[in-house]
Design a protein with these regions (language model features):
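Membrane-interface extramembranous regions
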Residues: 2-159
Length: 159
């Protein structure tokens, strides 16, 4: 039996990366729509020091939808992926607020452990967004990102 050649694995990883791009795009579009369908959830995690809570929830929802759509097109993928990186960094304080304050935990009916689980989840999302921003990456990095993508999908489906 012959071992599978390196070119085969490269093509397989490239196809999986495309699959991950469209899947993540769908997740961001879906999350953006959820800002409108489940407004109360997102409003509850906006830190109280921020004003214009409604606008923050709706604008961030629109941004997620737009970035998800732009991720689908090769011409706009690089900018969309970096937009996702920026968005993840900007909204991270909401996850911190959810963890450190019992107010949003009680409003959403989640435990401190569930709130804590959201914090490290941002790291794979950032790495995957970076992976999607570059056309070619090393085989090892692509394998890492493939693994992180699978864990991300499992996490998304479990919440």
């Amino acid at each position: 039996m012959q071992p599978i050649n390196s070119e085969y694995w490269s093509k397989l990883i490239d196809k999986f990366k495309i699959f991950s791009i469209y899947t993540i795009a769908l997740f961001y579009i879906s999350a953006g729509v959820t800002h409108f369908k489940n407004y109360d959830f997102f409003e509850a995690i906006v830190p109280p020091v921020l004003v214009f809570k409604s606008e923050i929830v709706y604008v961030s929802g629109v941004i997620e939808i737009v970035l998800g759509l732009l991720l689908c097109f090769k011409k706009t993928r690089h900018k969309a992926a970096w937009g996702i990186v920026l968005l993840l960094i900007i909204v991270f304080p909401a996850n911190l607020y959810l963890y450190f304050s019992d107010v949003p935990q009680e409003a959403l009916g989640i435990s401190i452990n569930q709130a804590f689980n959201r914090l490290p989840f941002q790291i794979p999302l950032l790495i995957i967004a970076y992976w999607h921003s570059i056309e070619k990456s090393s085989k090892k990095f692509s394998i890492l990102c493939t693994f992180l993508f699978i864990l991300t999908v499992i996490y998304f489906l479990s919440i």
